[in-house]
C-alpha cells in the first residue's frame, strides 16, 4: 500500500507501475486534493480513503508511507500492531540506485548544501540527480545514466529509512525543530 496521495505517493506509484508491482493507494483524508488525478493516472489501483477496516490491513504486507504523514498517526500504529512493514521511499531508492549517493540531513542548511554539492558535481561533468526532500521525489531521479545522486533527507524521511548507506553522508547542525 502507498499511504499518502501526494507528490511522493505519485512517485512511488509510478515506480511500482514500471516494476509491475500492484498497489493500493490509501489516504487518511476523505478527499485528498490529487485523488481524481490519481484515479485517472492509475485506473488499476484500489483506493482506500479515510476509514481503514480490518480487510485493508489483512490485504497488505508492506506500506510505503509519505513523509508528510506524522509518525504518531493512528493508521501507522494499527499497521505496526498488525505486523505490517512500514518503509519510506528512501528505502526503495537506496535499494535501486546504481550510482553513489551523497545523503545530507540536519536541522538547517540541507537544501543549500544539497544544491551546492549537486551543482559542483554537475560542473565537474557528471550526470547528477539532485532531489529528495528538495526538488523532485527520489524515485523520480532513478536513471541508469546517472553517475551521482545528491539527496536531501528530512527527519521524517529518515524515521522510516532502512539499510540506507550513502557513499558519503553529511549530518549538518542539529537542533530542536
Language model features with spans:
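N-terminal leader/targeting and accessory segments in enzymes
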Residues: 1-88, 92
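Phosphate-binding loop of NTP-binding sites
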Residues: 17, 54-58, 67-177
